[in-house]
């Protein structure tokens, strides 16, 4: 195989400033696009973290409200159970409503 010869004796001429600026100008839109993209990703990341914190606070508040509601439900169940006792019903019937147990003359047996 034949190998190509390379000449290293030639020195590249220094580029002119205008050419360097032109080359930089070609990269500027890409760098700007990358910078904008990184900014958008950063803003989205911060927004999502703030949203997660807000949702965690909301979950904690709802959990607290649920606990309060369950305690209220248990208290109301106990109150209903105490109001349903036969002794209390009889006391309310006699005291507040003026009711009494019927006498033998007030009882009618139907055959």
Swiss-Prot record:
GO terms for biological process: cell division. Residues 48-111 are periplasmic. Residues 1-26 are cytoplasmic. One of its GO terms (cellular component) is plasma membrane. Residues 51-85 form a coiled coil. Keywords: Cell cycle, Cell division, Cell inner membrane, Cell membrane, Coiled coil, Membrane, Transmembrane, Transmembrane helix. The keyword Transmembrane applies. It is a single-pass type II membrane protein. It is found in: Cell inner membrane. The chain crosses the membrane at residues 27-47. Pfam families: DivIC. The keyword Nucleus does not apply. Belongs to the FtsL family. Essential cell division protein. This is Cell division protein FtsL. It comes from Geobacter sulfurreducens (strain ATCC 51573 / DSM 12127 / PCA). The gene is ftsL.
């Amino acid at each position: 195989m034949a190998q190509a010869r390379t000449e290293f004796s030639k020195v590249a001429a220094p580029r002119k400033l205008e050419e360097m600026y032109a080359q930089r100008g070609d990269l500027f839109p890409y760098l700007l696009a990358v910078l904008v993209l990184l900014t958008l990703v950063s803003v989205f990341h911060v927004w999502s973290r703030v949203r997660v914190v807000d949702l965690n606070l909301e979950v904690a508040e709802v959990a607290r409200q649920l606990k309060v509601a369950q305690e209220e439900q248990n208290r109301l169940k106990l109150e209903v159970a105490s109001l349903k006792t036969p002794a209390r019903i009889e006391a309310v019937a006699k005291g507040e409503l003026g009711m009494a147990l019927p006498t033998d003359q007030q009882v009618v047996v139907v055959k």
